[in-house]
UniProtKB/Swiss-Prot annotation:
It comes from the Bacteria. Keywords: Ribonucleoprotein, Ribosomal protein, RNA-binding, rRNA-binding. InterPro entries: Ribosomal_bL9, Ribosomal_bL9/RNase_H1_N, Ribosomal_bL9_bac/chp, Ribosomal_bL9_C, Ribosomal_bL9_C_sf, Ribosomal_bL9_N, Ribosomal_bL9_N_sf. Binds to the 23S rRNA. GO terms for biological process: translation. This is Large ribosomal subunit protein bL9.
Amino acid sequence: MQIILLQRIVNLGKLGETVDVKPGYGRNFLIPLGKALPATKANIEKFEARRAELEAEEAKEVAVAQERADALTDVNVIMRAKSGDEGKLFGSIGTRDIAEALTNSGLEVDRAEIKLPEGTLRQIGEYNVDIQLHHDVTATILVTILSEDGDNEDLDEDNAADENEDYSEE
């Protein structure tokens, strides 16, 4: 089944492309959700008439996402969690926890936008976390996890080791 994409779809194509998909995927998912149109002559003409409007909407979405990304630059989220002697957390810090911490600090981020490719965070330390606000716009924030009981010797030792490595290279 050939369809015209009305928006970018990951692993399928960009706005305006005509692509082949399985009939069920097109009929039951893409077309009912307004993400695509069947590629008939009438729909192709109708799409070409709306192309500028759809591209303008896409540009607005990118601009809004870029503004949000600019607001997230240099954000450092500090979270406290219970941990064992070796810095291993009892439990883990996931996307929901990070989204909640960002919301509490006044920045609206949906948990689906937070990307943790290696899974949840399970150790005390500093982590760079990507937030994908749009398929073209990604922001990176720093998440620092500290021990809830105030014993952050592992983090301090790691920082001291990093500083010593920096000085030894010079």
